[in-house]
Design a protein with these regions (language model features):
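Hydrophobic/aromatic residues located in beta-strands of well-ordered beta-sheets
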Residues: 66-67, 108, 185
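Alpha-helical recognition/docking segments in bacterial nutrient-uptake
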Residues: 1-89, 93, 156-159, 163
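Short, conserved loop/helix-junction motifs that constitute active-site signature segments
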Residues: 57-63, 102-103, 175-180
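Short, polar loop motifs at secondary-structure junctions
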Residues: 69-74, 142-146, 161-162, 186-192
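Hydrophobic alpha-helical segments within soluble ligand-binding/sensing domains
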Residues: 50-56, 70-109, 203-222
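Short beta-strand elements in bilobed, periplasmic/extracellular small-molecule ligand-binding domains
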Residues: 2-14, 108-111, 128-146, 155-156
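Flexible loop/turn connectors
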Residues: 151-237
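An alpha-beta-alpha
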Residues: 87-131, 225-237
């Protein structure tokens, strides 16, 4: 951590470009460091890494005060602190780690919400397709877990949103399939509750991301650091 003498404020902009710009302008000279996780959405609720206005606003921040976390698809040339996820290759690599268990299933489904309040990078989708194609696995893309979804023995689902995970596990139990036997489930991004419930996850290490940012701030160092992304094997696969 940065230490007990530091003070941190959290401002949430809900992937909204206008709100982000207003927050940044309002707090232009308020802080020693600006830690930004750049994820934006279009009017059609699609994910974009940045907007031209956001890049211009971020570029006004002195680079020795700038920390970009999570998403590094932003056009800033001068060196600064950058801890990022490689969304496409992260999911590809994590699924490859679990390949021996994944191959026992007949078909893979990625539940990727096309229109979400907090949209997800499409690079997740690209990495999943790349994995399935390379290892000749049958797959499909779903927008959500519907209440009347048809489940078959041998299906493996990868969910991103919590609501889809809850709906899926509920239906697996109601239809008397065995979780991790008849039907597999992998969830994107780990939480303590998923650990408690034995849900297999593929996840970046958010704690490590924060620790790396704190260390680089204290060391006054700059540079790009890829954050670890892990396959966490539990009972649902």
């Amino acid at each position: 951590s940065i230490g007990g003498n530091s003070h941190t404020d959290l401002h949430i902009y809900h992937c909204d470009n206008s709100l982000f710009l207003n927050l940044l302008e309002k707090n232009r000279s308020a802080y020693d460091y600006y830690i930004i996780m750049p994820h934006f959405k279009t009017e059609q609720m699609k994910h974009v890494s940045y907007t031209e206005e956001a890049v211009r606003a971020i570029n006004k921040i002195p680079k020795d005060k700038l920390v970009i976390m999570d998403n590094n698809r932003i056009a800033i040339e001068d060196p600064f602190i950058e801890i990022f996820q490689d969304f496409e290759n992260d999911i590809y690599g994590a699924l490859q780690e679990g390949l021996s268990k994944i191959k026992k299933y007949s078909k893979l489904f990625l539940v990727y919400p096309e229109n979400s309040v907090y949209p997800y990078p499409r690079r997740i989708l690209y990495g999943f397709r790349k994995f399935c194609t390379e290892f000749a696995l049958d797959y499909d893309i779903l927008e959500e877990i519907y209440d009347d979804i048809i489940l078959k023995k041998g299906d493996l689902f990868i969910t991103i949103e919590e609501s889809d995970l809850v709906n899926l596990v509920t239906q697996i139990r109601e239809k008397e399939f065995s979780l991790g036997g008849d039907i597999g489930v992998i969830s994107y991004n780990d939480t303590p509750l998923k650990e408690l419930l034995g849900i297999t996850c593929i996840s970046t290490d958010f704690k490590k991301m924060g620790e790396t940012a704190a260390r680089m701030i204290l060391d006054k160092s700059k540079g790009k650091v890829k954050n670890p992304f892990n396959f966490i094997d539990r009972d649902s696969l």
